[in-house]
Curated annotation (Swiss-Prot):
Putative transcription factor. Involved in hair formation and spermatogenesis. May function in the differentiation and/or maintenance of the urogenital system. GO terms for cellular component: nucleus. GO terms for molecular function: DNA-binding transcription factor activity; DNA-binding transcription repressor activity, RNA polymerase II-specific; RNA polymerase II cis-regulatory region sequence-specific DNA binding; zinc ion binding. SMART domains: ZnF_C2H2. Pfam families: zf-C2H2 (PF00096), zf-H2C2_2 (PF13465). The keyword Transcription applies. GO terms for biological process: epidermis development; germline cell cycle switching, mitotic to meiotic cell cycle; keratinocyte proliferation; kidney development; meiotic cell cycle phase transition; mesoderm development; negative regulation of keratinocyte proliferation; negative regulation of meiotic cell cycle phase transition. This is Putative transcription factor Ovo-like 1. It comes from Mus musculus. Its main location: nucleus.
Length: 267
């Protein structure tokens, strides 16, 4: 049996070094932090023929296999070196935090098609469109124009008021066709269909969904404005929305008649 299988040879170049053997003036040039996981460079020696000797530095060999950009020095101890690119930003806490901050700001603010952002001068929040900024500015108004008749809470938008009132009346017009759940908003129904039933809504880019006319008195829904008005006349003749709609219809009818009379002088 060969002697190599019986006697284990001492490792001539290990990753651990006896620093007591070095003079003080040479320690600073040779020292490499152990936290980086790198072995100190060793002079090259011709390896002896041995079939049973394992790698003397498995940590450095494992790191060299993970990243092909590391260079491997010849010899029994593999020495891993940093790549040529600048990686100082990975060790500098200040630059690392700034990098993360820039990425977060891109996700939060979004990228405007024209590169212009509309910024709120009160809270410094930015938007990609002027209409979004105009809607946001309403939240800074101290006077709330639209008040809830149930609890007195004020809102600056009729949409927010309508959504809030449904929490008092219990009106849930958007019903799931696959179960018994109903929701106050269309987006909540679409989220329910996607997460619970796995139904993905297919809409084209900027495609408007079919409008649903909801009776805030009883929760009845209609697909057309005419059907909604007929329902109000039959079931809720004293509804303020019906009076408002009647005024709009009367004004539209008067404008139509006026335009017809101006276009036909012989009438």
């Amino acid at each position: 049996m060969p002697r190599a299988f019986l006697v284990k040879k001492p490792c001539v170049s290990t990753c651990k070094r006896n620093w007591s053997e070095l003079p003080d003036e040479e320690r600073g040039e040779i020292y490499v932090p152990v936290s980086l996981g790198f072995c100190p460079p060793q002079p090259y020696r011709e390896p002896e023929a041995s079939v049973a000797e394992p790698p003397s530095c498995p940590l450095a060999l494992d790191m060299s296999l993970r990243d092909s950009s590391y260079s491997v020095a010849p010899g029994p101890c593999v020495v891993a070196q940093l790549p040529s690119e600048d990686v100082s930003h990975l060790t500098d806490p200040q630059s690392r935090d700034q990098g993360f901050l820039r990425t977060k700001m891109k996700v939060t603010l979004g990228d405007s098609p024209n590169g212009d952002l509309f910024t709120c001068h009160i809270c410094q929040k930015s938007f990609t469109h002027q209409r979004m900024l105009n809607r946001h500015m309403k939240c800074h108004n101290d006077v709330k124009r639209h008040l809830c008749t149930y609890c007195g809470k004020g809102f600056n938008d009729t949409f927010d008021l309508k959504r809030h009132v449904r929490t008092h009346t219990g009106v849930r017009p958007y019903k799931c066709s696959l179960c018994d759940k109903a929701f106050t908003q269309r987006c909540s129904l679409e989220s329910h269909l996607k997460k619970i039933h796995g139904v993905q809504q297919k809409y084209a880019y900027k495609e408007r969904r079919a409008k649903l006319y909801v009776c805030e008195e009883c929760g009845c829904t209609s697909e057309s404005q005419e059907g909604h008005v007929l329902h109000l006349k039959e079931r809720h003749p004293d509804s303020p929305l019906l009076r408002k709609t009647s005024k709009k219809v009367a004004v539209a009818l008067q404008n139509t008649v006026t335009s017809l009379l101006q276009g036909s002088p012989h009438l």
